[in-house]
Curated annotation (Swiss-Prot):
Record gene name: XPOT
Function according to Swiss-Prot or TrEMBL: Mediates the nuclear export of aminoacylated tRNAs. In the nucleus binds to tRNA and to the GTPase Ran in its active GTP-bound form. Docking of this trimeric complex to the nuclear pore complex (NPC) is mediated through binding to nucleoporins. Upon transit of a nuclear export complex into the cytoplasm, disassembling of the complex and hydrolysis of Ran-GTP to Ran-GDP (induced by RANBP1 and RANGAP1, respectively) cause release of the tRNA from the export receptor. XPOT then return to the nuclear compartment and mediate another round of transport.
Positions of post-translational N-acetylmethionine modification: 1
Gene Ontology molecular function: any one: small GTPase binding
Organism: Pongo abelii
Protein name: Exportin-T
Main location: nucleus
Biological processes per GO annotation: intracellular protein transport; tRNA re-export from nucleus
Subunit structure: Found in a complex with XPOT, Ran and tRNA. Probably found in a complex with nucleoporins. Interacts with Ran and tRNA in a GTP-dependent manner.
Keyword 4Fe-4S attributed: no
Length: 962
């Protein structure tokens, strides 16, 4: 072997050596017999370096995985012998191999097993067992091989072909017949031999039993001698976690409901008498997390048994199953309330399913009612934050607690289904007592009290948030709690979690303020002062900006008395912060978007006359326009690229803010009705010069383009005079992405204004197409994926543009471009339909073609178009689906084929018998289609029902493709 190259396998080797080692590995993979050198090195223990041994196994792994069928019988025998002799050597080695080498060796054994077991090596396990016997090193490798085989056969994370899946099923069936009882016996012997002397091997063996129990005969494991041994392991500290997992797999195995019930009950009796049902908070939490998972599995298994027995009408056994479930509830509650969230989380499934049973019962016993209440109290307690929770840097622990809270929320929702009155009463009790003394209560208790009120909104669902009408007792309870929330002063609590929960809840129950509007001023003040938008925490300010926007929007009819006051108070929050002013703004630009939108909503929905609305909107937008002009001048002069970028960002924010205010308008309150057209036209005139700025083009164009999209909706035809010059600037020096983003703007204008923009479209049609073609024809690196994707997206945008033009009744825009240009456009559509393997673009192209045939395909169509139909469009309808890349199993491609069928139907509709004659006598014979199939095709085409032809066309091409 190349010793120099092998040096590069060391993790500390420099990059040149590592590159050489990689190249050597590739070379050995390709070489037909280099693997033999590696096999020999392993069998004869030529190398002591761990990385070289691992490397040799990798080469063998590649050989077995990808090239095994190419080997001769002798070579295949050599690989078997190499592995067995390596295994034998492990019995004698003074030191065991490193874990990563043992795992890799096990993977190679497993690959060889799945390749040879059914054909050449049926005695695989017997051969291995005869080598390893009960030698601890041998047993370790045997167990690793079993786990690797399980991964190959059963692991759902490994994607298998249908062929491999069939093979794996056959292997498992054969193993069940031939060797599983022997394997199970070997596991029993290993467990018995090593349970007190070698915990590592025992735990490995328990893992193997747990893995295999899912697909072998359960009676081999679920019997007295095996179960008693596993239960014995539950009392041995180093084994009990693995024993728990193994028992969980046994309990999880599907079986007859009565047998499952008996199995679970027998396990529980032993565990209970051994004291496992009394949970000690100080107990080892890792073990309790596994134990909780086991109890969850047992509980859910009993519930599945109960469901099956009820379904089968076996009431007697169902009653027994329910009794068995009830006796586990006390244990479930101990685990649910445990201070460690992992332990609690692992039992939630059982708890949830138990509540589902109670929901189905017509009457609950006193004990069941007590259980519901106990679960409710446990959920309320567990929703509470820990004292040491880090709110400033939540990290992974924070994410896990958020996830855990979501699980608890599901329990709360289920509790509401079982006993809504009890839930409401419990929450009300906790909420009221906590808020009476909030000044002296710890933050986590105050937060959870408000949180529970918040969660009731989803737990007790109503349509359109109408919590304060309908059921009187529920409405008055919620109303009381909301009144307490907004009048208690708790919004001043000095903790971010309480502050945020206050605002979230106020917005969640916004309908309360239509019932008791007298509380609006104090809540508005909370939003606007140091409790909300001016809070010391950026996180609170940011979230409040969004919630304030929602609050104002949902209560806009109640806002009229406060509008001017609010606008004055948020004045400083609306300031555009230029990069050079140095001071940190209270809100980020993203947060400011919500404040601008809120200001817009207040103005537009006010009861003021149009003149007042216009004046207020001008006050809001004029500072933006003034700042914009100054910043644009500064950008033109800026030399430093970093400064250019920050100025461009600021300009972009200004445009974005103006754009966001326009979201307040609606069909009822249009820009015109509010008298605000002039203000937005001024904005347009202010922002458009940014398009001619040669610096930071991407960001400036993107902002102005978005603003134009909004103005087309808001200002309608008043925006049209600005479009030609804006388009001209946006077509200068553009890249694929610029064009791709510009085309939707033109599509929007075309679809909205149609004939009104015909002169403009005629004028800019070819310049736009030239810009597109120029970018598409630019050479790119062969393997530049992003460039290829950009071109694909641009091509799609181009075809979408043509589709918009043709479907908006503007085909004369194309027709008036001169014969040569028209032909060029049509040819690109044919290319799009046939040549590019992009079903989305192909579908669009066929839509364009069928539309053009519909418009121009009759007797009075443009000169030469009928020829084009027969020379190009008809062939496209056959050549595209016949391509290998046209995958009829793909949903998008089927849609493209559907439009192809529409195109052919439209040609037949416009050209009549002439079309059928052309297909029968010229085109289809030229494709060597059999006469009877031609006949069949033409009959299908002439069917009045288009769906019949679409279905036929799919079958036609499925038959035609090899």
């Amino acid at each position: 072997m190349d010793e120099q190259a092998l040096l590069g396998l060391n993790p500390n080797a420099d990059s040149d050596f590592r590159q050489r080692a990689l190249a050597y590995f590739e070379q050995l993979k390709i070489s037909p017999d280099a693997w033999q050198v590696c096999a020999e090195a392993l069998a004869q223990r030529t190398y002591s370096d761990d990385h070289v041994k691992f490397f040799c196994f990798q080469v063998l792994e590649h050989q077995v995985k990808y090239k095994y069928s190419e080997l001769t019988t002798v070579q295949q025998q050599l690989i078997r012998e190499t592995l067995i002799s390596w295994l034998q050597a492990q019995m004698l080695n003074p030191q065991p191999e490193k874990t990563f080498i043992r795992n890799k060796a096990a993977q190679v054994f497993a690959l060889l097993f799945v390749t040879e077991y059914l054909t050449k090596w049926p005695k695989f396990f017997f051969d291995i067992l005869s080598v390893v016997d009960l030698n601890p090193r041998g047993v370790d490798l045997y167990l690793r091989i079993l786990m690797a085989i399980d991964s190959e056969l059963v692991d759902r994370d490994v994607v298998h072909t249908s062929e491999e899946a069939r093979r794996n099923t056959l292997i498992k069936d054969t193993m069940r017949e031939q060797c599983i009882p022997n394997l199970v016996e070997s596991w029993y012997q290993i467990l018995q031999n090593y349970q007190y002397t070698n915990s590592e091997v025992t735990c490995q063996c328990l893992e193997v039993v747990g893995a295999y129990v899912s697909w072998i005969d359960l009676s081999l494991i679920a019997n007295d001698r095996f179960i008693n041994m596993l239960l014995g392991h539950m009392s041995i500290e180093v084994l009990r976690e693995e024993a728990c997992d193994c028992l969980f797999e046994v309990v999880n195995k599907g079986m007859d409901p009565v047998d499952k019930m008996k199995l679970v009950e027998s396990l529980c009796q032993v565990l209970q008498s051994a004291g496992f049902f009394s949970i000690d908070q100080e107990e080892d939490v890792d073990f309790l997390a596994r134990f909780s998972k086991l109890v969850n599995g047992m509980g859910q298994s009993l519930i599945v048994s109960w469901s099956k027995l009820i379904k089968n009408g076996d009431i007697k056994n169902a009653q027994e199953a329910l009794q068995a479930i009830e006796t586990k509830v006390a244990l479930m509650l101990q685990l649910l309330i445990h201070e460690d969230d992992d332990i609690s989380s692992n039992i939630i499934g059982f708890c949830y399913d138990y509540l589902h049973i109670l929901k189905q019962l017509t009457v609950l016993s006193d004990q069941q009612k007590a259980n519901v209440e106990a679960i409710m109290l446990a959920v309320m307690k567990k929703l509470t934050y820990d004292e040491e929770y880090n709110f400033e840097n939540e990290g992974e622990d924070g994410a896990m607690f958020v996830e855990y809270r979501k699980q608890l929320k599901l329990l709360l929702d289920r509790l509401a289904q079982v006993s809504p009155e009890l839930l409401l009463a419990s929450v009300r009790r906790v909420f009221t007592s906590t808020l009476q003394n909030w000044q002296t209560t710890r933050f986590m208790e105050v937060e959870v009290a408000i949180r529970l009120l918040y969660m009731l909104a989803e737990a007790l669902p109503v349509s359109h948030g109408a919590h304060f009408s309908g059921d009187v007792s529920k409405a008055s309870a919620l109303q009381d709690m909301m009144r307490t929330l907004v009048t208690s002063g708790v919004s001043s609590y000095q903790h971010t979690s309480v502050t945020l929960e206050f605002f979230e809840t106020v917005v969640r129950y916004e309908k309360f303020f239509t019932v008791e509007p007298q509380h609006i001023p104090c809540v508005l003040m909370a939003f606007l002062d140091h409790r909300g938008l001016r809070h010391s925490s950026a996180k609170v300010r940011s979230r409040t900006a969004y919630l304030f926007s929602r609050f104002v929007k949902s209560l806009n009819k109640q806002m009229n008395p406060f509008i001017e006051d609010i606008l004055n108070r948020i004045q400083d929050l609306l300031e555009l912060s230029p990069p050079e002013n140095g001071h940190q703004s209270l809100l980020s630009s993203d947060d400011q978007l919500f404040i601008y939108e809120t200001a817009g909503v207040l103005i537009v929905n006010s009861e003021y006359p149009a003149e007042r609305k216009q004046a207020l909107m001008r006050n809001l937008l004029t500072p933006l326009m003034e700042k914009f002009k100054i910043l644009l001048e500064k950008l033109m002069l800026a030399q430093d690229e970093e400064r250019q970028a920050s100025l461009a960002d600021c300009l972009n924010h200004a445009v974005g803010f103006a754009s966001r205010t326009s979201k307040a308008f609606s069909n009822k309150q249009t820009v015109k009705q509010c008298g605000c057209s002039e203000v937005y036209l001024d904005c347009l005139q202010t922002f458009l010069p940014a398009l001619s700025c040669p610096l930071q083009k991407d960001i400036l164009r993107s902002g102005v383009r978005t603003f134009l999209h909004r103005m087309i909706i808001c200002l309608e035809e008043e925006v049209l005079p600005f479009i030609p010059s804006a388009s001209e600037h946006m077509l200068k020096d553009c890249e694929a992405k610029d064009l791709q983003e510009f085309i939707p703007l033109i599509n929007q204008i075309t679809a909205k204004f149609k004939i009104q923009v015909s002169p403009f479209l005629q004028q800019m049609f070819m310049p736009l197409l030239h810009a597109i073609f120029e970018v598409l024809l630019r050479p790119a690196e062969e393997n530049d994926q992003s460039a290829a994707l950009e071109k694909q997206m641009l091509r799609r945008s181009y075809f979408a543009f043509l589709q918009t033009v043709t479907s908006s009744g503007m085909s004369e825009v194309i027709a008036n471009q001169g014969a040569e240009n028209v032909e060029r456009v049509l040819v690109t559509v044919i290319q799009g339909a046939v040549e590019y393997p992009d079903p989305i673009a192909q579908k669009t192209c066929f839509i364009i073609l069928s539309k053009l045939v519909e418009l121009w395909g009759g007797k009075d169509g443009p000169v030469g178009f009928a020829d084009f139909v027969y020379k190009h469009i008809v062939p496209a309808c056959f050549l595209a689906p016949l391509k290998q890349t046209f995958d009829l199993a793909d949903a998008q491609t089927v849609l493209a084929l559907s439009e192809c069928a529409v195109t052919l139907k439209t040609i037949h509709l416009k050209r009549g018998p002439e079309c059928v004659q052309y297909l029968q006598q010229e085109y289809l014979p030229s494709l060597q289609v059999a006469p009877e199939i031609i006949q069949e095709f033409c009959q299908a085409l002439q069917q009045p029902d288009a769906k019949v032809f679409k279905n036929y066309l799919k079958v036609f091409f499925q038959r035609a493709k090899p």
